[in-house]
Regions:
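Mature, folded catalytic cores of secreted/periplasmic enzymes
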Residues: 1, 15, 22, 30, ...
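Glycine-rich beta-strand-turn "strand-cap" elements at beta-sheet edges
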Residues: 1-8, 41-63, 85-110
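Short hydrophobic/aromatic beta-strand micro-patches
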Residues: 13-15, 65-67
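Helix N-cap motif at beta-to-alpha junctions
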Residues: 19, 67-73
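Short amphipathic alpha-helical segments
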Residues: 20-48, 81-92
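Short, solvent-exposed loop/turn and secondary-structure capping segments
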Residues: 77-78
Length: 110
């Protein structure tokens, strides 16, 4: 059984107040993301994917899909995400809504 068979998934919807807020977060992530991703990986983050939402009137929305080895791995990553919120999101106005669950079905061409 591979790690992706039964991961814990978090889907986060991010809505920014302005293009400037989105740009600020993107710049901060570009600068700081690699160090955080290494720590998240060690704690059980398997992957993440960012997608801009294009079927809405606003261009200020995106979703992020995070896959973790388990619910425990997700919990172990939470202190790191708290740091990320304080550094990467600092100075930006952003509304974050998260949905979490256990994968019931997964398909990939890989």
């Amino acid at each position: 059984m591979s790690e992706i068979d039964t991961p814990f998934t978090n889907v986060t919807l991010q809505t920014f107040a302005s293009e400037g807020d989105m740009a600020l977060v993107n710049q901060q992530w570009e600068k700081l993301g690699a160090k955080y991703l290494e720590r998240l990986k060690k704690n059980g983050l398997l992957s993440y994917e960012v997608a801009k939402i294009w079927n809405k009137d606003t261009k200020l929305m995106r979703f992020v899909i995070f896959r973790y080895k388990s619910a425990d791995a997700y919990k172990n990553c939470q202190p790191i995400w708290s740091e990320i919120e304080k550094t990467v999101f600092k100075g930006a106005v952003i509304k974050v809504t998260a949905y979490r669950g256990i994968t019931e079905e997964y398909w990939s061409i890989q």
